[in-house]
Structures are given as structure tokens and as C-alpha cells.
Amino acid sequence: MTEQEPASKPIVFTTHARQRMRERGAREDDVREAIRIGQRETAHRGLVLYRLNVEFNREWDGRYYGVQQVAPVVAEEKDRFVVVTVYTFYFQEGEKA
């Protein structure tokens, strides 16, 4: 039996992850995309961190940013991905065009 490719595994979100997404301004579609095509890094306790920079071009927390980095921390199970938490980072601070 072969291990499923990332594109075919379902992605589930813990309550904690959904709360952090709301607090940190991450959209579910961007988190899913980060897991599918983002840069993969080993994290603590057997978890995996994915990173994906997405075009943002709007305000967050009173400042305007061009790029948002979405970084979900994931438990990769045999048949699914479980999003444990989500970090976000903002870049290219500037002014609205």
C-alpha cells in the first residue's frame, strides 16, 4: 500500500488551530494551499511546519502589508493531515496604493 500524496489526503483542523487562524488573520484556503504546495520543515514532537507566502495587499492590525506568510503546524497521519496550530507573518509594510 502506498502512502497517499498530499493532494489526496483530507485536511482537518483542531479547535485550537481554527482559533489561532481567526486571531492571526489566516484564511482556511491559504492554510490548505500551504500544506499542498508550501515549503515543508520538520518541527518539534514529530510535527511538520509548512510555509507559504501569499499576496496580501491589505491592512492587518492597523498596518498595510503586501505579503502574508501562512505557516500551519501539522500532524501528518497516514490518512489525513491534522492542523494543530497556525502562525502568520506579515511583510512589505507600506501604504495603500
Where would I find each of the regions flagged by the language model?
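Ribonuclease/tRNase effector modules and their secretory precursors
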Residues: M1-A97
